[in-house]
């Protein structure tokens, strides 16, 4: 029986795995089997942490807005509720950025809402 030369498909698959794992440390970037395992583990972590990142950023934005509005005597929930009642559709990222970089603007927004509510 004559010897059959192998094709390139397995080599191409391993090359793709090696390129993905090239920044891993130690044997995780050099050995095919461990690189494959670490690639699967990395993809699981990436998928899981995308959802986790959304939750953590939302918590951070709420904490920033709450800290800024409490200095003005308004609670976070009151501010968000009044924004929705006035149909000002701001997500939590925008007021958090305003609270971080331009606190007076957030004070003006909350005072305007409070003033209209009293009238």
From Swiss-Prot:
<dbReference type="GO" id="GO:0019843">
    <property type="term" value="F:rRNA binding"/>
</dbReference>
<dbReference type="Pfam" id="PF00453">
    <property type="entry name" value="Ribosomal_L20"/>
</dbReference>
<keyword id="KW-0699">rRNA-binding</keyword>
<keyword id="KW-0687">Ribonucleoprotein</keyword>
<dbReference type="GO" id="GO:0006412">
    <property type="term" value="P:translation"/>
</dbReference>
<keyword id="KW-0150">Chloroplast</keyword>
<keyword id="KW-0694">RNA-binding</keyword>
<comment type="function">
    <text>Binds directly to 23S ribosomal RNA and is necessary for the in vitro assembly process of the 50S ribosomal subunit. It is not involved in the protein synthesizing functions of that subunit.</text>
</comment>
<keyword id="KW-0689">Ribosomal protein</keyword>
<dbReference type="InterPro" id="IPR005813">
    <property type="entry name" value="Ribosomal_bL20"/>
</dbReference>
<dbReference type="GO" id="GO:0003735">
    <property type="term" value="F:structural constituent of ribosome"/>
</dbReference>
<dbReference type="GO" id="GO:0009507">
    <property type="term" value="C:chloroplast"/>
</dbReference>
<comment type="similarity">
    <text>Belongs to the bacterial ribosomal protein bL20 family.</text>
</comment>
<protein>
    <recommendedName>
        <fullName>Large ribosomal subunit protein bL20c</fullName>
    </recommendedName>
</protein>
<dbReference type="InterPro" id="IPR035566">
    <property type="entry name" value="Ribosomal_protein_bL20_C"/>
</dbReference>
<keyword id="KW-0934">Plastid</keyword>
<dbReference type="GO" id="GO:0000027">
    <property type="term" value="P:ribosomal large subunit assembly"/>
</dbReference>
<dbReference type="GO" id="GO:0005840">
    <property type="term" value="C:ribosome"/>
</dbReference>
<dbReference type="GO" id="GO:1990904">
    <property type="term" value="C:ribonucleoprotein complex"/>
</dbReference>
<dbReference type="InterPro" id="IPR049946">
    <property type="entry name" value="RIBOSOMAL_L20_CS"/>
</dbReference>
């Amino acid at each position: 029986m004559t010897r059959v030369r192998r094709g390139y498909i397995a080599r191409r698959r391993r090359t793709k795995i090696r390129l993905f794992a090239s920044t891993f440390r130690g044997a995780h970037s050099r050995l095919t089997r461990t690189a494959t395992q670490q690639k699967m583990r990395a993809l699981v972590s990436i998928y899981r942490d995308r959802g986790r990142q959304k939750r953590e950023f939302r918590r951070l934005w709420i904490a920033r807005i709450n800290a800024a509005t409490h200095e003005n005597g308004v609670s976070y929930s009151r501010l968000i509720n009044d924004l929705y009642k006035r149909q000002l559709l701001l997500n939590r990222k925008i007021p958090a950025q305003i609270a971080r970089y331009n606190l007076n603007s957030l004070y003006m927004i909350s005072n305007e809402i409070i003033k209209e509510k009293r009238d």
